[in-house]
Amino acid sequence: MTNYVAIDIGGTNIKYGLIDQDGQLVESHEVATEAHKGGPHILQKTKDIVASYLEKGPVAGVAISSAGMVDPDKGEIFYAGPQIPNYAGTQFKKEIEESFQVPCEIENDVNCAGLAEAVSGSGKGAGITLCLTIGTGIGGCLIIDGQIFHGFSNSACEVGYMHMQDGAFQDLASTTALVEYVAKAHGEEVGHWNGRRIFKEATEGNKLCMEGIDRMVDYLGKGLANICYVANPEVVILGGGIMGQEAILKPKIRKALKNTLVPSLAEKTRLEFAHHQNTAGMLGAYYHFKTKQS
């Protein structure tokens, strides 16, 4: 049976596993990224994962999803934030192919998550899919007819940096922004709060927590509306850990979009939450690999 190694490199953890020729995840594992140790360390960890699978038998390829800005044609990272030192310039495709003589492809993690949703998740069958991941920051991707829209310099849909009246989109509508707002409202340290606690206390009647959620949703709705006016997606898919609170967030976000978009656009723009959770990066990396290698 033909198998592919799929690796999803995040700032906290590296998820990896085997995907078979039918696109099914056969097994999956997780290891700490140790991002503070930098790009060379992450590259070596990736090589160790590939080597461990090759010891058990042949693989048809290595599909990688990674944080940072990725040039999928060169197969390398061309920009990464300070959270992962010396990551920019890491040549995954070249290093993996030269070390193991197997084909390798790499793509940005949010693009991979969006591709997974467009191919086999909440966006299946849609012509234009906008996918946003809400977490520490906000990442975005646009999938058009099953293809990732990269833009001229592989920087399309970096919506977290989008300027809004009160600051950058991700500084207003991310999980980080929510936690910081609620902590400040309570006069407490940020470390005392997280998304899970905020939603729990909001449902128990904590007005400051609900106020923080409503504030985040308001900014999220405005940012989403701006993107929808430009891209006119058929479906908007929201992912990230905090979107697990779908029962609370979905009606609020739907209302925010309805209040911000013109009626004709609001009626025709479908809002969904991500179907694939922890496996999205690996599945999307596999779909990207198959497209690049076809």
Residue locations for each model-derived region?
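Glycine-rich phosphate-binding loop of actin/hexokinase-like ATP-binding domains
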Residues: K124-T176
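A short acidic/small-residue loop/turn micro-motif
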Residues: T33-E34, P85, A156-E158
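Residue-level detector of high-confidence beta-strand sites
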Residues: S28-E30, A80, G151
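A charged helix-plus-loop insertion that forms the helical arch/lid used to bind
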Residues: E76-G89
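Hydrophobic "anchor" residues
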Residues: L25, I77, I148-F149
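Short loop/edge segments at beta-strand edges and connector loops
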Residues: I106-V110
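ATP-binding/phosphotransfer module of carbohydrate and carboxylate kinases, centering on a glycine-rich
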Residues: M1-G61, D71-K74, E98-C104, A116-I128, ...
